[in-house]
Amino acid sequence: MDAFIRVANQSQGRDRLFRATQHACMLLRYLLESKAGKEAVVTKLKNLETSVSTGRKWFRLGNVLHAIQATEQSIQATDLVPRLCLTLANLNRVVYYICDTVLWAKSVGLTSGINREKWQMRAARHYYYFLLLSLVRDLYEVLLHMGQVARDRAKREKSSGDPPKYSVANEESEWLQSFLLLLFQSLKRNPPLFLDTVKNFCDILIPLNQLGIYKSNLGVVGFGGLVSSVAGLITVVYPQLKLKAR
């Protein structure tokens, strides 16, 4: 109950909760559409999905300011790669939210003469750039942590006097096993990095589908959005699990 109250008291938390509901409806609708006798349920899910999506617009109006603040914070990062990636990513997020606000204004009749399709594609393009740059930052962090895990393991093996248990061998299978083990240990050591990587990877399926770069069905987009929303909710409930800039 305390966790729910904490989420409900934050605009970002409410947005993530609504987003999880929206994508859960999308996923359920995909699973039920092919089943006979479920037409009424599918219609209700579609209506709920539309209502939740409309409700989210009110929370997202303030996200432009939040994205600007995030851009200012990312400029102060000490590591060059995260600073560059996060600054460019957040600038694209600012433009995305501006496009989203224009689309919202068009949908409620506050403005006219707006080409909806053009603005939707513009928003999807900047959302894609934001997520792509965020994933580049995640990859950089993963590689740094993998290097640290490899160095720590080498020190332990050297101090114990035991022969190395894993090495980059000539055989491809052994190399792959060593790489996957390093990756697993790196993400296990750093839950915030794991959550951020999962969230961004699942989210990028949405603009990839919208831009036609990689077409997915409704079920894949709904599942990806749901997983991403749950990961985002976890960071709202437990702020210590949010990935910090170096």
From Swiss-Prot:
Cell membrane among keywords: no
Major subcellular location class: membrane
Membrane topology: Multi-pass membrane protein
Keyword Transcription regulation belongs to the record: no
Positions in the Cytoplasmic compartment: 1-93, 239-246
Tissue specificity statement from the Swiss-Prot or TrEMBL entry: Expressed at high levels in kidney, liver, lung, brain, and testis and at low levels in heart, spleen and skeletal muscle.
Keywords: Membrane, Peroxisome, Peroxisome biogenesis, Transmembrane, Transmembrane helix
Chain segments carrying region Required for homodimerization, interaction with PEX11G, and peroxisomal localization: 218-238
Induction: Induced by clofibrate and di(2-ethylhexyl)phtalate (DEHP).
Record-annotated membrane-spanning stretches: 94-114, 218-238
Stretches of the chain found on the membrane's Lumenal side: 115-217
Annotated GO biological process: brown fat cell differentiation; peroxisome fission; peroxisome membrane biogenesis; peroxisome organization; regulation of peroxisome size; signal transduction
GO cellular component, one term: peroxisome
Pfam families: PEX11
Function in brief: May be involved in peroxisomal proliferation and may regulate peroxisomes division. May mediate binding of coatomer proteins to the peroxisomal membrane. Promotes membrane protrusion and elongation on the peroxisomal surface.
Record family assignment: Belongs to the peroxin-11 family.
Annotated PANTHER family: PEROXISOMAL BIOGENESIS FACTOR 11 (PTHR12652), PEROXISOMAL MEMBRANE PROTEIN 11A (PTHR12652:SF22)
Subunit structure: Homodimer. Heterodimer with PEX11G. Probably interacts with COPB2 and COPA. Interacts with PEX19. Interacts with FIS1.
Record protein name field: Peroxisomal membrane protein 11A
